[in-house]
Amino acid sequence: MAGHSKWANIQHRKGRQDAVRAKLFSKLSKEITVAAKMGDPDPDKNPRLRLAVKEAKSQSMPKDNIDRAIKKSQAGDGDEYEEIRYEGYGPNGVAVIVEAMTDNRNRTASTVRSTFTKNGGNLGETGSVGFMFDRKGTVTYPADVGDADTVLMAAIEAGAEDVESSEDGHVIWCADTDLNEVATALEAELGESEQTKLVWRPTTTTELDLEGMQKLMRLIEALEDDDDVQRVTANFEASDEVMEQL
């Protein structure tokens, strides 16, 4: 999918920075706590919590942190978080979706709007760019789990929609509502996946040169620096040469 592997590479490179990593762990903990509070504190009985725990493990979050986040959900106190999605345009008309989890809607809306404005973008209404994305589930495996045909057959049997295989690994796509079932079936056939998550998959992309990518990254990093923001997705496309210069 256009932009997907490049997006993953950006996230991986950013994840090496300690400060970014600490903030990431904080966001992952919040997702785990909210998921556990909304359902069962046992990941085996709570699909959303299972996904949150798996994502935390894929980012090398310590088990103690994960357990502490689950226990926090059962404490009976703490903040009540509301999930909100913001949509807008970044530099060069790139569509941007911001997923937030906040205990103060007004504060978060003000901060997100200001961040868009200061970084060459503008915040739109809900639905203003959402039509350019599909909500999908993804299950990722390393390249050595099997060849493309082996993974494709397993994906078809599991009820997946699409498979992208490359030297970097295999990305299996499915309907968002089928992610838990598809991931479970794949793990029975191929073993534990590297990552299982819900994403926004762009249906159209905007090609950016180096200057455009640098401007977009400034916006994305500023948005991600907000503690209320959980995830940022953009429908950019860029050449390998541009990506290497970032």
Swiss-Prot record:
Its main location: cytoplasm. It is found in: Cytoplasm. This is Probable transcriptional regulatory protein RD1_2018. The keyword Transport does not apply. It comes from the Bacteria. Belongs to the TACO1 family. Keywords: Cytoplasm, DNA-binding, Transcription, Transcription regulation. GO terms for biological process: regulation of DNA-templated transcription. One of its GO terms (molecular function) is DNA binding. HAMAP family: Transcrip_reg_TACO1. GO terms for cellular component: cytosol. SUPFAM superfamilies: YebC-like (SSF75625). Signal peptide: none annotated.
